[in-house]
Amino acid sequence: MEKKQRKQLVIQMLTAGIITFCLLWLLFYIKKYVPFGVHSLASKDADFQYLDFLAYLKDVFDGKNNIDYSFSKSIGGACIGVFSYYLSSPFILLLLLFDKSQLVLFVHVIITLKLACAAATFAFYLNRRFEEWNDGSVKKQALIIFLAVSYAVSQYGIAQACNIMWLDGFYMLPLIMLGVYRVVNGGRPVMLSVSVALAVLFNWYMGGINCVFACFWFLFEFAYSRLYSGDTKAEKTVIKDFAGKLGRFIYSMLAGVLISGVLFLPTIGAMRYSVRGSLDLGSLLDMSFIGGVSSVIDGYSLGAQSQKGSVSLY
């Protein structure tokens, strides 16, 4: 990448992130959210659970509790599962700068930072994925910034503000998508492996969801590359090409998951002894449909939320 292109990329990422950050804080000011009022995005589970977990982690930082085992967890228990699901985001380190009385403000700060980061990573994805299309013109740079901000403040990003740990997967997804694109088009698999590893480390649940999405995105990118490459190879050659790229994709994904094993494996071990719930594998074979097919279409309306019989997909 030339120096001018790198400069444009940095400007696009910073501009998209700053616009998103300022836009969200402007809305907080207008709607009187903390610190400008009494309203809070820490609602539902964030109010019932996450604030308590943040208070626990603040005690850990202050040397008043243990990250591995805590008596504040029910009657006492290992906390590695709680940490890896709720508290392993790199943004959580900013908690060191806040007091316990400022936890709601802290939640608002990391929400805006994570969504700003999502805008920056999506701008990075658009710039590198459509490199041939991006000629550096002001019009196309503005379009990249607009689309990046739109991604960050989409309904999913705003709706999941009360699930702050899920937003890490939101800003990591564009990097995984770019990694898939590079694997399909003969690039190095490092970006995909590292992105998957970080996504799982930051939140294993959303990291897993991103991995599932990556499988579908691989199929899309391969089909796109075949349709628009103008290549007229025989069917057997296409199958061989698909098998080779699929192998590189699987290898890259597995490498990422293995890297994340430093935290993921202890989490699995902790979950094995959890009595909070169980998985019925037989239910995976149940192909019944809850609700009507039309409810999926209704779920795309502005402000729609998922409920039993009516799913809102993103």
What do these predicted regions represent?
Residues 44-61, 90, 245-246, 253-314:
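Periplasmic/ER-lumenal interhelical loops and adjacent helix-loop junctions
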Residues 29-130, 134-174, 198, 202-205, ...:
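Active-site lumenal/periplasmic loops and adjacent helix-entry segments of GT-C-fold
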Residues 96-100, 132, 182-186, 295-306:
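Conserved helix-loop functional segments at active or binding sites
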Residues 33-37, 100, 131-132, 186, ...:
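Transmembrane helix-loop junctions in multipass membrane proteins, especially transporters and channels
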Residues 46, 82, 101, 189-190, ...:
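Juxtamembrane loop-helix boundary motifs flanking transmembrane segments in multi-pass membrane proteins
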Residues 1-33, 240, 244-249, 253:
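Start-transfer (signal-anchor) and selected internal transmembrane alpha helices
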Residues 21, 112-125, 139-224, 245-268, ...:
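Membrane-embedded helix bundles of polyisoprenyl
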Residues 1-6, 133-137, 225-245:
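Membrane-interfacial, low-structure loops and terminal tails that flank and connect transmembrane helices
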